[in-house]
Amino acid sequence: MTTLNFPSVLVPLVGLVFPAIAMASLFLHVQKNKIV
């Protein structure tokens, strides 16, 4: 049961973490451009 449950927990986690990192890096890039 644990092996079946692990991917179903991992997929939404990656689906939320990856866009969050992408948005954070984009935000930092915009902030850097505004300061310069």
Swiss-Prot record:
GO cellular component terms given for this protein: chloroplast thylakoid membrane; photosystem I
Listed Pfam families: PSI_8
Superkingdom to which the source organism belongs: Eukaryota
Subcellular compartments: Plastid, Chloroplast thylakoid membrane
Keyword annotations: Chloroplast, Membrane, Photosynthesis, Photosystem I, Plastid, Thylakoid, Transmembrane, Transmembrane helix
Example GO BP: photosynthesis
Membrane topology type: Single-pass membrane protein
Predominant subcellular localization, coarse grouping: plastid
Signal peptide (residue range): none
Membrane-spanning ranges: 8-28
The protein's role, per its UniProt record: May help in the organization of the PsaL subunit.
Similarity-based family: Belongs to the PsaI family.
UniProt xrefs under PANTHER family: PHOTOSYSTEM I REACTION CENTER SUBUNIT VIII, PTHR35775
Protein name: Photosystem I reaction center subunit VIII
Protein's organism: Helianthus annuus
